[in-house]
């Protein structure tokens, strides 16, 4: 069964980007190749700072949506406590 991940990367400009994937390593490589999300294209390189694993896509997508509503400070606290 496929694993589903929500991840946060720290961009070159120190901003945070939250995303969903089934392969974290490949997705980070895609972001760093400039072929990922439009947001990260001009903010490379990106560094993985957080990830959570889920057994279903729907769980992961719900969590991604939740994290995207968090303030920067909430995300930083979550990263720090991981």
Swiss-Prot record:
Residues 2-77 form the GIY-YIG domain. InterPro entries: GIY-YIG_endonuc, GIY-YIG_endonuc_sf, UPF0213_domain. SUPFAM superfamilies: GIY-YIG endonuclease. CDD domains: GIY-YIG_UPF0213 (cd10456). SMART domains: GIYc (SM00465). Pfam families: GIY-YIG (PF01541). PANTHER family: UPF0213 PROTEIN YHBQ. Belongs to the UPF0213 family. This is UPF0213 protein SH2523.
């Amino acid at each position: 069964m496929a694993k589903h991940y929500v991840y946060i990367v720290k961009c070159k400009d120190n901003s945070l980007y939250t995303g969903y994937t089934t392969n974290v390593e490949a997705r980070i490589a895609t972001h760093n190749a400039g072929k990922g999300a439009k947001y990260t294209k001009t903010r490379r390189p990106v560094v993985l700072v957080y990830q959570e694993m889920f057994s279903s896509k729907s769980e992961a997508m719900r969590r991604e949506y939740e994290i995207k509503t968090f303030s920067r400070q909430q995300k930083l606290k979550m990263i720090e406590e991981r």
